[in-house]
Regions:
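Minor-groove-contacting beta-hairpin "wing" of winged helix-turn-helix DNA-binding domains
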Residues: 94-102
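Short, amphipathic alpha-helical interaction segments positioned at domain boundaries
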Residues: 102-117
């Protein structure tokens, strides 16, 4: 049984931003951006929360409670990239650290993407 594709998603680094590009099966392509500084902060938070597990919303609340200015879109873009690169696993609808060094692995993948595409 062949299922129709829902969408194609790619990531790249442009102008010091992680860019998530989406081409849906129907509708117009779109993209969302996450500045490098926000990505790095989100990676730190994911490392801090990764053992207990977290949702997009709980990470966003964690960051805002700490007085850091990140947006829902920033968190969504960063988490999608971290899951795509197997730095986070999803279990029971919660993100969990898949590595012992989430921040280091996240930044390594970010810079590798920036250099190599």
């Amino acid at each position: 049984v062949t299922t129709p594709r829902e969408r194609d998603e790619t990531s790249e680094v442009l102008d010091d931003h992680l860019v998530r590009q989406v081409v849906p099966a129907r509708g117009q392509p779109y993209e969302h951006r996450c500045p490098r500084a926000a990505f790095e902060q989100i990676a730190h938070a994911a490392e801090e929360l990764g053992e207990q597990g977290f949702t997009l919303e709980s990470l966003l609340e964690y960051e805002r409670t700490a007085g850091r200015d990140v947006t829902f879109t920033n968190v969504a873009v960063a988490l999608a990239f971290l899951r795509e690169r197997s730095i986070l696993d999803v279990r029971y609808r919660r993100n969990h650290a898949a590595t012992t060094s989430v921040h280091l692995d996240a930044m390594t993948e970010y810079h590798a993407l920036a250099e190599n595409g």
